[in-house]
Regions:
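Conserved beta-alpha-beta core of the PfkB/ribokinase-like small-molecule kinase fold
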Residues: 157-237, 253-255
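Conserved phosphate-binding/catalytic region of the ribokinase-like
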Residues: 1-12, 17-18, 31-37, 179-183, ...
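Conserved phosphate-binding/catalytic loop of the ribokinase/pfkB sugar-kinase fold
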Residues: 107-111, 122-168
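Hydrophobic beta-strand scaffold residues
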Residues: 80, 106, 188-189, 246
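Glycine-rich phosphate/adenosyl-contacting loop at the front of the ribokinase-like
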Residues: 1-81, 93-94
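Alpha-helix C-terminal capping segments
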Residues: 70-79, 123-125, 291-294
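A glycine-rich helix N-cap at a beta->alpha junction
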Residues: 98-115
Length: 334
């Protein structure tokens, strides 16, 4: 087989294009909603408007799991691109401006009609845990025709978020992108995203891991949920023969990375005050993939992920503030 041509993009992500509205709330607010604390619940447009009215104005900032990852990776010097659908409305313009300003290539045409740009109500409780209610809006309009075959073939890593598996059209877009990437000999990375996403799509996710995924990102709850066990070691034993690398984050306990026949235990990077855990897993993936595409060893990749995650949980919002590259370089020198 002829090796693939050198890519001009390091990481291409497919994901939901979302603007987050972040609010600090007490646990009583979460208890009064039909949601799972710490998880993501899908809601409709009417519910989103009602929740916005209940919570009041919050801090608006661009989000979306895979989008957060490629923004973080771009800040670390990685050549990145993103595929996701917004509407040509105010929030769509905010999302487009923010992701391009971060240095991420974003060419998906906005929808001119249909649902508005996706919005996620992120409720941060005093323990810094985030609970999300997401109205997918225009994101559900993403389909196979939005996948640029040439761009996928020209990208070293195709990164997919599990959340995107919910809308059927987006699911088919992911399947098409996977076929193209595998045909070109590129790596496919998947983030399981959320334990409840795993519950919804366990059979499909198991099939993806069995047949298509090279790099798997998950937290311990997602990984154990995937294999229907409470035993993390058992889940690792199940996944290790199937993927090149599995990276499992464990909150304040750091991360465990298995690959190349080795297991790397990565300690959590001290974050000082933990303000908001939104985006921690996204930024771990960003740091890891930055190291991976730069040819770093797995331990260094994990350390880069841990440092990036620690930065993003030290402030409100799911995207890094300035200086991430210098911070990671200082903590994990080449």
């Amino acid at each position: 087989m002829t090796p693939p041509a050198p890519p001009s993009v390091d990481v291409l992500a497919l994901g939901n294009a979302i603007v987050d509205v972040l609010s600090h709330v007490d646990d009583a607010v979460i208890d009064g909603l039909p949601v799972n604390k710490g998880g993501m619940t899908l809601i409709g447009a009417v519910e989103a408007q009602g929740l916005y009215g209940t919570l009041g104005p919050g801090v608006e900032c661009s989000g979306g799991s895979a989008a957060n990852t490629v923004v973080g990776a771009a800040m670390l010097g990685v050549r990145t691109a993103f595929v996701g659908r917004v509407r040509d409305d105010q929030l769509g313009q905010v999302f487009t401006h923010d992701i391009r300003a971060a240095g991420v290539r974003f060419d998906t045409a906005p929808a001119t009609d249909g649902p508005e740009t996706a919005v996620c109500m992120v409720m941060v409780t005093p323990d810094a845990h985030r609970t999300m209610c997401t109205h997918l809006g225009a994101s559900i309009e993403l389909g196979p025709d939005d996948v640029d075959e040439a761009l996928v073939r020209d990208s070293a890593v195709l990164y997919l978020e599990g959340y995107l598996w919910d809308p059927p059209g987006a699911r088919e877009a992911m399947r098409r992108a996977i076929r193209i990437a595998k045909d070109e000999g590129r790596a496919v990375a998947l983030s399981l995203s959320d334990p409840f996403a795993v519950d919804r799509h366990r059979a499909d996710f198991l099939d993806l891991v069995d047949n298509d995924v090279d790099i798997l990102f998950a937290n311990e709850h997602e990984l154990t949920s995937l294999y229907g066990t409470d035993d993390l070691d058992r889940a690792f034993n199940e996944v290790m023969p199937l993927v090149k690398v599995a990276a499992c984050t464990r909150g304040e306990h750091g991360a465990v990375i298995v690959g190349d026949g080795e297991t790397h235990v990565i300690p959590a990077e001290p974050a000082g005050q933990v303000v908001d855990t939104t985006g921690a897993g996204d930024l771990f993936a960003a740091g890891f993939l930055a190291g991976w595409t730069q040819g770093r060893n797995l331990h260094d990749c994990g350390r880069m992920g841990a440092v990036a995650a620690a930065e993003v949980i030290s402030h409100l919002g799911a995207r890094p503030e300035a200086g991430l590259r210098a911070l990671v370089t200082a903590k994990v020198p080449a």
